[in-house]
Amino acid sequence: MSITAGPKVTTTAALVNTDRKMNNHHSTQVLHGSGQHGMQPSGNNVLNGLANGATGLQSSASSTSTRDDSTIVGLHYKIGKKIGEGSFGVLFEGVNMINNVPVAIKFEPRKTDAPQLKDEYRTYKILSGSEGIPQAYYFGQEGLHNILVIDLLGPSLEDLFDWCGRRFSIKTVVHVAIQMITLIEELHDHDLIYRDIKPDNFLIGRPNQPDANMVHLIDFGMAKLYRDPKTKQHIPYREKKSLSGTARYMSINTHLGREQSRRDDMEALGHVFFYFLRGQLPWQGLKAANNKLKYEKIGEKKRSTNVYDLSQGLPVQFGRYLEIVRNLGFEETPDYEGYRKLLLSVLDELGQKLDGEYDWMKLNGGRGWDLAINKKPNLHGYGHPTPPNEKSKRHRNKFNQVPLAVNNLNGSNVPLQSHSPLPGGTDLTQGVSNAPQQPQQIMSQQQYQQHTQQRLDPMSYEAYKQQVQQRYAQQPQPTQQKAQKSPNNDTSQQQFSQNRQQQPQYQFQQNQPQNGKVQVADSNSEKGFFSKLGCC
């Protein structure tokens, strides 16, 4: 049984029917929105055969855009402003040029140690048609990146929580909690566990849409199969597992290195509910010498915090929920409907109803949230960025005031002289030094105009692409001496460079479906014990 707050809405499938008929390239994008009442969300090898013929993955040759316009990907998705960034890569808003439907475009470097977009795309296709799950339209390669295009949504619950003074009313928490439980139930029904429950990954819809205040779930890069889709055989219980998720919300069993299952998603939801009700959790702000000790402290604090103390001054039903899910067995099926009824009883006791009214609808004199007023606090979600910090402001001002050096014919940078040099050749842009001065190069008017034209909007795709190209160009190349020290002394520097260039393609292809079955790597195989941990 699915319970949602507010009027029932249709899925996004109808909106993209025209697009899917006209485009053979499926892709996915992340969410984001602007306006009133809304803003901004891997399984393992058991996934064999689950998405046979359903994912529509294209090879790199067929999925790479052939358009001359550098701001168009996937043949007809035009890239707009940057709206988010994080460890995964960068997120841009965009538009489907065929039907003018807004989309989100997620960029992931192809050379990343743990690519996730391909597995995330598969998960979106598995969940396609589920209420509260954005539609995935396209996945492919564009230059140095993997690209995912999905529905554009509104702000995350974390953003709305900030805008509402970092405290939700009991009524709003019940509204969102019921929807969050239903979304996780839908994921579990498709044999997947989420493993990274946090407010940042739950978004509401875009303004002026039927689902403007409906909670959606995004970002399935950490999702994993907990049972075989065909036989329904549950994964075995194991210990000494690496931590996966966000330390602030993860379950106690996850801190203890135990294999995650459905119970861990439900416990993490309980921690989010108390976060919304209390404003913060008792294990926030703990200090330690390093991250490993910090996560251990968080786990110890969770174990030592009594649920009764956590529920002080709050409806007892929230504490009861946390007690129930913490006592679930490893393979036990959660009572999703029972949890919803338990939380609905809170409204009954308060004499309130599930009427679809949320705290964020009261912002700005009852007009609701507005990005022109309510700023996105950071770029790690899927909202609009805030102005740069003081350090970046200084960098920006310096960039705007001092002409950059122009590369000479030898490829080295030389300092530039002001356009109006002072008598005696004095240049105020240079520091005072007794060392012999290098020959200075005066920038011509034409060079200055070209330099000015290169000042791109830092939120634009062109600026991001320029940064990526510069970063790759600055990567050190292996010397001939290093190549001779390699195990194969016959390998030339040219062959070594070719192997490096071919490596990303191999990494992308190695998870391609084999023998008609989808092979998905277990994200626990990543190097590093804390490689999957989020903010705590």
Curated annotation (Swiss-Prot):
Residues annotated as catalytic: D196
Keyword Lipoprotein: yes
Keywords: ATP-binding, Kinase, Lipoprotein, Nucleotide-binding, Palmitate, Serine/threonine-protein kinase, Transferase
Organism: Kluyveromyces lactis (strain ATCC 8585 / CBS 2359 / DSM 70799 / NBRC 1267 / NRRL Y-1140 / WM37)
Biased composition (Polar residues): 26-42, 407-420, 427-436
Superkingdom of origin organism: Eukaryota
Function: Casein kinases are operationally defined by their preferential utilization of acidic proteins such as caseins as substrates.
Protein family membership: Belongs to the protein kinase superfamily. CK1 Ser/Thr protein kinase family. Casein kinase I subfamily.
Residue positions of covalent lipid attachment, annotated as S-palmitoyl cysteine: C535, C536
Enzyme class, first EC level, given as a word: transferase
Comp. bias (Low complexity): 43-65, 437-453, 463-514
Domain Protein kinase: 77-361
Protein name: Casein kinase I homolog RAG8
PANTHER family, per database record: CASEIN KINASE-RELATED
Region (Disordered): 26-68, 407-524
Matches recorded under Pfam families: Pkinase (PF00069)
Single GO term (MF): ATP binding
Catalysis performed (reactions): L-seryl-[protein] + ATP = O-phospho-L-seryl-[protein] + ADP + H(+); L-threonyl-[protein] + ATP = O-phospho-L-threonyl-[protein] + ADP + H(+)
EC number: 2.7.11.1
Binding site for ATP: I83, G84, E85, G86, S87, F88, G89, V90, L91, K106
